Design a protein with these regions (language model features):
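N-terminal signal-anchor module of multipass membrane proteins
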Residues: 1-29, 177
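Hydrophobic core of alpha-helical transmembrane segments in multi-pass integral membrane proteins
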Residues: 1-11, 51-66, 102-111, 145-161
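Hydrophobic core segments of alpha-helical transmembrane domains in multi-pass membrane proteins
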Residues: 21-30, 72-85, 116-129, 171-180
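Membrane helical hairpin/interfacial module
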Residues: 24-45, 52-61
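C-terminal ends of transmembrane helices
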Residues: 32-43, 81-94, 128-136, 183-194
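Membrane-interface helix-loop-helix junctions at boundaries between adjacent transmembrane segments
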Residues: 43-48, 55, 61-112
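Generic multipass alpha-helical transmembrane bundles of integral membrane proteins
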Residues: 105-140
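C-terminal transmembrane-bundle signature of multipass membrane proteins
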Residues: 129, 136, 140-194
Length: 194
């Protein structure tokens, strides 16, 4: 998630992965995985809750973005803090070190040293685990979910590959993306991973 704070896709400091590979990973793998929230909300009669979370988060993000830079920082702090909370589910238990610490270190090291670490984590751990965790909801209505996930992936990929620079370089669009991610995390934490 830390990639969203970076102002331009070409400024992402990596190692092996190039900006174009980042772009394809973000738009084709990472961005669409949250659509399973919609499937879950339909099956579990939580559509109202899902829409409330997304509405409140988007409106709140918009309101925050109207203030000075110190207040705007609240959105980034919320974004990173909730990412740490969310990613803890993927972290190992090693020597009683809290999963939150591993999650924090993942983001910190990715931001400071190389976004390749984060991209590989998302591709090889988080997104596959996300689908695995949500498989019980996906398999209940396979065709609906195949169509939903495929359509979302195609849309994210096409929009992202055509407009990613615009999104990343426009604070309004960037805040919308952050609020969508925050909404996904809140919904997952409250209704799926609780």
């Amino acid at each position: 998630m830390a990639f969203i704070i970076t102002p331009h896709i070409n400024n992402l400091h990596g190692g092996i992965l190039t900006p174009i590979i980042y772009q394809h990973i973000i738009t084709g793998i990472i961005a669409p995985h949250g659509i399973t929230d919609l499937s879950h909300s339909i099956q579990e009669n939580k559509v109202k809750e899902l829409l409330s979370i997304y509405s409140i988060t988007n409106i709140g993000s918009f309101c925050i973005s109207q203030f000075n830079d110190n207040i705007k920082l609240l959105l980034d702090i919320s974004f990173l803090s909730l990412s740490i909370i969310h990613f803890r589910h993927d972290m190992p238990v090693i020597n009683n070190i809290p999963k939150y610490l591993w999650s924090f270190l993942l983001l910190y090291i990715s931001i400071i040293y190389s976004y390749d670490i984060f991209m590989l984590y998302m591709c090889l751990s988080h997104v596959p685990k996300h689908y695995l965790t949500n498989w019980k909801y996906i398999k209940k209505n396979k065709w609906f979910n195949i169509i939903l996930i495929t359509t979302t992936t195609i849309l994210c990929y096409l929009l992202g590959n055509n407009y990613l620079d615009l999104i990343i370089n426009n604070i309004f669009y960037l805040n919308i993306v952050k609020s969508i991610v925050i909404s996904h995390i809140i919904y997952q934490e409250l209704y799926i991973l609780n």
